[in-house]
Amino acid sequence: MKQKLIILSADAMVTEDLSLLKTLPNYKKYLAGGVECDHIKTIYPTITYPVHTSVVTGCYPDKHGIYGNLDFTVGLHKQPWAWDHKHVRRPDIFDMAKKAGCTTAAVFWPVTGNHEHIDWLCDEYWPQGPEDTVHEAFKRMGSSPEVLSIIDRYEPILTNRVHPGCDEFLIHVAADIVTQFQPDLLAIHPANIDAYRHHTGVFTPQVDAGVIETDRFIGIIMDAVERAGLLESTNLCLISDHGQIDVVRNLCLNVKLVQAGLIRLDEKGEIKDWDAYVLSGGASALVYLKDPADKRVWQKTKDLLDGLCAEGVYGISHVYTEEESRREERLGGDFSFVLETDGYTSFADSWLPPLVRSFDTSDYRTGHATHGYLPDKGPQPVFLAKGPAFKEGFRTGVHPIVDEAPTFAKALGFEMPDDIDGKAMDELLR
């Protein structure tokens, strides 16, 4: 019997949510009695796009090259996102599945735009302005004519980046892909729980409603599996990427860089030149230098950041150099420094005063709760699975999130590359 695998990543679901989830009908029908990991250790930064790339590559950000949601561009008040798969530097589970002869699908899985080895693709993306259309937007990100016809069918329920409308859309698109094409590997990423935490806090009635919605999403997908006659051969994995922590303020550190002369503005308050720039990742931030080889600017920036950290009022608990974050947290890239939150501050990008701001729920980084912090902080992500590849009623202890890709691969009968960072959770598999 050829097995199939569905990965449903419920963004920002945490272990504390499972007590409610386990009372709900679709968990009981499709996941109860399977396997569960007590503690999944995620990556740094605890941000959706880097984590999901680690989930499918089995590698840390220093290898796969995704270390934030955004495609860094200086001077923009709204940064573009890293939607396209071209940013990923390592083979992922979709690449290896195709090499093994499997069919593949992904719906709203991060950083999969124009992925050549996903047969049925609906990238996490949205129209880029009032002139753009849903059809053209998803076509631009690699959706095939067959998938575009499904997207067109459900467009009326798609609310751009507004939850749960966009989640209802993606779940129905995924369900139709199951019934029409029966992919061997399907990865899905609803983000309703994540959005509710950003908007209302880590543990609130709205978050509980999101857990109930997620159970219903499981039911919609698995009903499609049953209608396709595939239940006995399908493995379902419910995972997540990170938790969140409540914060009390947002702090715009680029204001301090302007005051230090490291960012220079024109008469309209826009950036005309820069030496250093702080890009928020929510509860952490990356600091870029225009010329990383300029030792004078590097030292000036480091001295400023160390001073802000030492004062204890600017939201920074630790300043990492790129070399330190690469060595200690496997976070490396073309930035020069990483700033870690003090546990109650989130960072924002603005270079204009005021320095300290209240919540702005239009940006995931500046809501009532956020993430991006070191992976040992806050509530932790989940891993549950049930199906013919997995043991029954088995619990395991701590695993790094990079162990998920090789585990998924083994469940489908193939291997990830030898030089990945993760190892399969063999104790969970039959």
Regions picked out by a protein language model, each given a short descriptive name:
Residues 71, 75-86, 90, 95, ...:
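Secreted, luminal/periplasmic, and some membrane-associated catalytic domains
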Residues 39, 103-108, 185-189, 238, ...:
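A structural signal for short, well-ordered beta-strand segments and their strand-loop junctions
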Residues 262, 266-296, 366-411:
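Substrate-binding rim/cap in mid-to-C-terminal beta-strand-loop elements of soluble/periplasmic
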Residues 18-62, 105:
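Short, structured active-site-proximal loop/turn typified by the sulfatase FGly-forming signature C/S-X-P-X-R
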Residues 60-201, 289, 300, 306-310, ...:
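His/Asp/Glu-rich, glycine-adjacent segments
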Residues 2-16, 29-30, 55, 97, ...:
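Beta-strand elements within well-structured catalytic alpha/beta cores of enzymes
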Residues 3, 24-25, 50, 88-95, ...:
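A structural signal for well-ordered alpha-helical segments within the folded catalytic domains
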Residues 15-17, 49, 112-119, 194-198, ...:
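Short catalytic/ligand-binding loop motif for oxyanion handling, primarily in non-cytosolic enzymes
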